[in-house]
Swiss-Prot record:
<feature type="binding site">
    <location>
        <position position="84"/>
    </location>
    <ligand>
        <name>glycerol</name>
    </ligand>
</feature>
<keyword id="KW-0808">Transferase</keyword>
<feature type="binding site">
    <location>
        <position position="410"/>
    </location>
    <ligand>
        <name>ATP</name>
    </ligand>
</feature>
<feature type="binding site">
    <location>
        <position position="244"/>
    </location>
    <ligand>
        <name>glycerol</name>
    </ligand>
</feature>
<feature type="binding site">
    <location>
        <position position="309"/>
    </location>
    <ligand>
        <name>ADP</name>
    </ligand>
</feature>
<feature type="binding site">
    <location>
        <position position="266"/>
    </location>
    <ligand>
        <name>ATP</name>
    </ligand>
</feature>
<keyword id="KW-0319">Glycerol metabolism</keyword>
<feature type="binding site">
    <location>
        <position position="313"/>
    </location>
    <ligand>
        <name>ATP</name>
    </ligand>
</feature>
<dbReference type="Pfam" id="PF02782">
    <property type="entry name" value="FGGY_C"/>
</dbReference>
<keyword id="KW-0418">Kinase</keyword>
<feature type="binding site">
    <location>
        <position position="135"/>
    </location>
    <ligand>
        <name>glycerol</name>
    </ligand>
</feature>
<dbReference type="GO" id="GO:0006072">
    <property type="term" value="P:glycerol-3-phosphate metabolic process"/>
</dbReference>
<feature type="binding site">
    <location>
        <position position="83"/>
    </location>
    <ligand>
        <name>glycerol</name>
    </ligand>
</feature>
<feature type="binding site">
    <location>
        <position position="15"/>
    </location>
    <ligand>
        <name>ATP</name>
    </ligand>
</feature>
<dbReference type="GO" id="GO:0005829">
    <property type="term" value="C:cytosol"/>
</dbReference>
<dbReference type="InterPro" id="IPR043129">
    <property type="entry name" value="ATPase_NBD"/>
</dbReference>
<dbReference type="InterPro" id="IPR018485">
    <property type="entry name" value="FGGY_C"/>
</dbReference>
């Protein structure tokens, strides 16, 4: 097995990617292809499931062949994916009955409101760890059954299959033989009991979704089956599955209770490992399964921030004060602080821990002396402040004081932002050498299942530090800044409340 590699497939919201990793956890090859975003109506977001499959299969082959290798060089495949996105297909033909309804899609928001009005939120949260929201898969499945002609009849006859993106890829890689998912993806459907780790019959009945549609739920690291497609001539074990944020938590080696990672992308996704027991959040966080390896199940708390890197894109495309996103660090660093300016980037409402859909983006503290540099710095600071709000909620829910924050994602390359994040938290922000932690996590899960890596300790030893950012700002200064931020958030919420 000396010359073999692990292939990680990273099926994201805007592109399908594939990466080859060697035994040291280094990236050997990478391929990526974007695909179409479909917006049939305002608030609706869809993907073509066949395009998800064709782009993912295409980059898988490309990542392997561009290094002069073939399928025999692949020891196993690990899959990580955009979560919650919902695909329903015909078991006989393998054809989708409707486009994939993407996690961002809000078409079922009114139906979710009606469930809340029936007083069901506490029950759903107790079973699934999730609030009732159109973000999750359950109401998307129901929408397809209610709105695609003949779908409900076919579903009752056992002729339809539902899957999140991982299930759809495995179904196609095995030529319609395997209909499986893992516990992490199942835990994002709003149909899965995270305590019993089974599909919940009461929730299925409530939403009128036949049990026969659902995939078998497996661990995140086991051999599910082997590839049977023409993508690879040889049969390759499919051996790891995890939703993208769960895979990133594993790739960051946040393997013990209290360890936290923050992925800085378009939004921010913070996840804390809470060990072998789920913690019900009292602070508007989501409780979820982190992963399962063998009989060992780890749980996590998660908080999502809607706008992080997107605020930098707005400064570039909407306001025009920078030409490229990379310019923001130098512009922001040209002033020592924001001079009292606060930017609350609630362009799409506020996510965790506020969950205020009506709040809107606001800038406070502007004076005649305010410059584009102050705005740029306020934008970066806002990413760190929002992350702090979620981390404070995590500490309150878990009773665990955070020792350090492991960071990844595009904006983690911004040293100014990382330093300010450490200053606010009062603990180190730690950046690894390999920031492709989502794909790496999927690779590790697959490799562990087949013995490519012996155990968790061997994998842990591969995590390498790029840079550690230690807090250096005086405590009273931090408290003053945080008080200003909290005031700005209160003002943004008040603005929203006054529009009633």
């Amino acid at each position: 097995m000396q010359d073999q590699y692990i292939l990680a497939l990273d099926q994201g919201t805007t592109s399908s990617r594939a990466m080859l990793f060697d035994r040291q956890g280094n990236i050997v090859s990478i391929a990526q292809k974007e695909f179409e975003q479909i917006y049939p109506q305002p608030g609706w977001v869809e993907h073509d499931p066949q395009e998800i499959w064709s782009t993912q299969a295409g980059v898988a082959a490309e990542a392997v062949t561009r290094t002069g290798l073939n399928g025999t060089s692949i020891a196993a495949i690990g899959i990580t994916n955009q979560r919650e996105t919902t695909i329903v297909w015909d078991r006989e033909t393998g054809q989708p009955v409707y486009n994939a309804i993407v996690w961002q899609d809000r078409r079922t928001a009114d139906f979710c409101d009606s469930l809340k009005k029936q007083g069901l939120e506490a029950k759903v949260r107790a079973k699934t760890g999730l609030p009732i929201d159109s973000y999750f898969s359950a109401t998307k499945i129901r929408w397809i059954l209610d709105n695609v002609p003949g779908a409900r009849d076919k579903a009752r006859q056992g002729k339809l299959a539902f899957g999140t993106v991982d299930s759809w890829l495995v179904w196609n890689f095995t030529k319609h033989e395997l209909h499986v998912t893992d516990v992490t993806n199942a835990s994002r459907t709003m149909l899965f009991n995270i305590h019993t780790r089974e599909w919940d019959s009461e929730l299925l009945e409530l939403l009128d979704i036949p049990r026969s549609m659902l995939p078998d739920v497996k661990a995140s690291s086991e051999i599910y089956g082997h590839t049977k497609t023409t993508v690879f001539a040889s049969k390759i074990p499919l051996a790891g599955i995890a939703g993208d944020q769960h895979a990133a938590l594993f790739g960051q080696m946040c393997t013990t209770s209290g360890m936290v990672k923050n992925t800085y992308g378009t939004g921010c996704f913070l996840m804390m490992n809470t060990g072998d027991k789920p913690i019900e959040s009292k602070n508007n966080l989501v409780t979820t399964i982190a992963w399962q390896i063998g009989d060992d199940v780890q749980y996590a708390l998660e908080g999502s921030i809607f706008i992080a890197g997107a605020v930098v894109q707005w400064l570039r495309d909407g306001v025009g004060i920078i030409k490229t996103a990379a310019e923001i660090e130098a512009l922001a660093a040209s002033v020592p602080h924001t001079d009292g300016v606060y930017l609350v980037p609630a362009f799409a409402g506020l996510g965790a821990p506020h969950w205020n859909a009506r709040a809107r983006g606001s800038v406070f503290g502007v004076t005649r002396g305010t410059t584009s540099a102050h705005l740029a710095r306020a934008a970066l600071d806002a990413i760190a402040y929002q992350s702090l709000d979620v981390l404070a909620a995590m500490e309150a829910d878990s009773g665990i004081s955070i020792g350090e924050l492991r960071v990844d994602g595009g904006a983690s390359a911004n040293d100014l932002l990382m330093q300010f994040q450490a200053d606010l938290l009062g603990v180190d922000a730690v950046r690894p050498q390999i920031t492709e932690t989502t794909a790496l996590g999927a690779a590790y899960l697959a490799g562990l299942a087949i013995g490519y890596w012996k155990n968790l300790d061997e994998v842990r030893s591969q995590w390498q530090l790029d840079r550690r950012f230690a807090p250096s700002m005086p405590k009273e200064q931090v408290e003053q800044r945080m008080a200003g931020w909290q005031r700005a958030v209160r003002a943004a919420k008040a603005w929203a409340d006054d529009t009633q």
